[in-house]
A protein has these predicted regions:
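A short alpha/beta connector and helix-capping loop motif
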Residues: 145-170, 218-221
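Generic beta-sheet signal
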Residues: 54-56, 132-136, 163, 213-223
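Short, small-residue-enriched loops and turns at beta-alpha junctions
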Residues: 171-176, 227
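Cofactor-binding active-site loop characterized by glycine-rich and histidine/acidic residues
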Residues: 12-15, 27-157
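Conserved thiamine diphosphate
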Residues: 130, 178-207
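Glycine/aspartate-rich loop-and-adjacent alpha/beta segment that forms the canonical ThDP
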Residues: 201, 205-257
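Short catalytic-loop micro-motif centered on adjacent basic/acidic residues
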Residues: 24, 136-138, 193-197
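N-terminal capping segment at the start of a domain
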Residues: 5-21, 167-169
Length: 257
């Protein structure tokens, strides 16, 4: 898994340099979570619409490049295709389009919607008595949206133990209105809540496979924006929505863990 995550980060850097687009630090903070989810969930790259697949939704849509690279390394399409990221004619937009990109279940970008759709899908699957599961990855800044908490109220009331919410707790939201002690808040909403080190794939996989005890599960992943590159992690705000020069890309590639 370490090699998988390093390869994903390398491609994020190279594609951002090539395209001039991408939120590199926030993409880096979710790499291990994406790797863990795609190693645990049921999915079929040869048949992205497979009826028995589990559902994954990336609600923090500005990390789309990390999702594309994860899908590519999971076999959904060649990595070289993603080098058109952000181009006018490309299917790989700066925010994902479910009608165009294999493996993308929801078009996202406006924050706070992913958890609502995920709860609705989980409820529908529960009514159908389907064994399929639903996963949604949200950001801590996104958690300022009331819709996140409304969807969790519904999920807890309906006992949606087939729903797992992963929180990218990279704490960059501390500049504005910080979400303090998020695990306590999720427990107060009657969610089965687990706190893990968000860059430890084995810990994430253990949390994903742990019993939900009849409740929606929330995994609070303690992450670092820009994780994997010292320069990005120490200067995350300076790199917000910024692509590297050729020299900077080579430096960052050399720093990758």
């Amino acid at each position: 898994m370490d090699c998988f995550c390093k390869s994903v980060r390398q491609d994020i850097l190279r594609i951002s340099r090539h395209s001039g687009h991408g939120h590199i630090p926030t993409c880096f903070s979710v790499v291990e979570m994406l790797a863990a989810v795609y190693s645990e969930m049921k999915h079929n790259p040869a048949d992205p619409s497979w009826d028995e697949r589990d559902i994954f939704i990336l609600s923090k849509g500005h990390a789309a490049l990390a999702h594309y690279c994860t899908l590519a390394h999971s076999g959904y399409f060649p990595v070289k295709d993603v080098y058109n990221f952000g181009a006018f004619s490309s299917i790989f937009g700066c925010h994902a389009d479910r009608h165009r990109v294999p493996g993308v279940e929801l078009s996202t970008g406006s924050l706070g919607h992913g958890s609502c759709v995920a709860a609705g899908i989980a409820l529908a699957l529960k009514i159908k008595k389907s064994p399929r599961k639903v996963y949604v990855l949200i950001g801590d800044g996104e958690s300022n949206e009331g819709t996140v908490w409304e969807s969790l109220m519904v999920a807890a009331h309906q006992k949606l133990d087939n729903l797992t919410v992963l929180l990218d707790h990279n704490k960059s939201q501390i500049r504005c209105l910080p979400i303090t002690r998020p695990a306590d808040k999720f427990r107060a909403f009657d969610c089965e809540t687990v706190e893990v080190e968000g860059h430890n794939v084995n810990a994430l996989r253990a949390a994903l496979s742990a019993p939900a005890n009849g409740k929606p599960k929330v995994i609070v992943a303690d992450t670092v924006k820009g994780w994997g590159c010292r320069t990005l992690a120490e200067n995350m705000f300076a790199w917000h929505r910024r692509s590297p020069s050729k020299e900077e890309m080579e430096m960052l590639l050399g720093e990758l863990k």
